[in-house]
């Protein structure tokens, strides 16, 4: 169901979120 999908999204953000933020900051500062 959609709740499972939502939980997967949260787990993915926990793992990938910091890396994505760092990449975005790098792109913004160039």
From Swiss-Prot:
Origin superkingdom: Eukaryota
One GO molecular-function entry: toxin activity
Cellular component, GO, one term: extracellular region
Claim: Secreted is one of the keywords in the record: yes
Keyword Secreted: yes
Cross-referenced InterPro entries: Poneritoxin
GO biological process: defense response to bacterium; defense response to fungus; killing of cells of another organism
Keyword annotations from UniProtKB, A to Z: Antibiotic, Antimicrobial, Fungicide, Secreted, Toxin
Organ and tissue specificity: Expressed by the venom gland.
Subcellular location: Secreted
Family classification: Belongs to the ponericin-G family.
Function, as annotated: Shows a broad spectrum of activity against both Gram-positive and Gram-negative bacteria. Also has antimicrobial activity against S.cerevisiae. Has insecticidal and non-hemolytic activity.
Record's protein name: M-poneritoxin-Ng3c
